[in-house]
Amino acid sequence: MQKVTIQEAEHLLQEIISEEDDRFQILIKDERKGVQKLISKWYKQKELAQKEKEKFLEMSKYENALREKGLTYIAGIDEVGRGPLAGPVVTAAVILPEDFYIPGLNDSKKLSEAKRERFYGEIKAKAIAIGVXIVSPQVIDEINIYQATKQAMLDAIANLSCTPEYLLIDAMKLPTPIPQTSIIKGDAKSISISAASIIAKVTRDRMMKELGEKYPAYGFEQHMGYGTKQHLEAIEAHGVLEEHRKSFAPIKDMIQK
């Protein structure tokens, strides 16, 4: 291989997947600083990819154990929006195929918005089934947030196109005959729950951005309904909306004034 330019070396390293590649053996002997920087970057990317693969395998242990027992339709279930002062609680149930693989998958709160959006598209394209349920602030006020979350999870399961054989749920137990396991911080421990958390988070964030357009003075697209200083000041200045949860403090106290 003739001596390549730095740009050509960069393109080659994007193609090379193993140190055993003859082209890599030539590049690693190239003493130019630019090439050595690219080699160092290549090693870091390989290390990151390996860590992501190991993390994904660790997060697949619940699903793999159930598949070894002959189960196929394993649904991960999670919610987003229990804590905010405004907007709905959104839940998702996701059944993934056995060959599903997205390196970097994690709890939706630990991902950037750009990654969440990208993973959302991949999950939608690859999942066997996805069910989503949305519970309004009015229902939350009527039956309380815990019961609303539970009902939303049951609705998300009912909205799946096939009946799950087993449920992996993030920190909840559901009144259903379907066998289940409740996993504390499950969105960081199970790929199915993680996928559900991403579907629920992106769905809710999009809804809150629409509310932000409808009520620009409240900044919903920035705080997603959580009780930030900006949000509380907007409520003081412009009042309580129908999208606010009247049973939540300090909204409840503001209404009673």
UniProtKB/Swiss-Prot annotation:
A Gene Ontology biological process term: mismatch repair
Functional summary from the UniProt entry: Endonuclease that specifically degrades the RNA of RNA-DNA hybrids.
Entry's localization field: Cytoplasm
Organism: Bacillus cereus (strain AH820)
Co-factor requirement: Mn(2+); Mg(2+)
Enzyme Commission no: 3.1.26.4
One Pfam family recorded for the sequence: RNase_HII
PANTHER family according to UniProt: RIBONUCLEASE H2 SUBUNIT A, RIBONUCLEASE HII
SUPFAM superfamilies (UniProt xref): Ribonuclease H-like
Keywords from the UniProt entry: Cytoplasm, Endonuclease, Hydrolase, Manganese, Metal-binding, Nuclease
Gene Ontology CC terms: cytoplasm; ribonuclease H2 complex
Domain RNase H type-2: 72-257
Details of cofactor binding: Manganese or magnesium. Binds 1 divalent metal ion per monomer in the absence of substrate. May bind a second metal ion after substrate binding.
Binding site for a divalent metal cation: 78-79, 170
Lineage: Bacteria, Bacillati, Bacillota, Bacilli, Bacillales
Superkingdom of this protein's organism: Bacteria
The name this protein goes by in its record: Ribonuclease HII
Entry-linked InterPro entries: RNase_HII (IPR022898), RNase_HII/HIII (IPR001352), RNase_HII/HIII_dom (IPR024567), RNaseH-like_sf (IPR012337), RNaseH_sf (IPR036397)
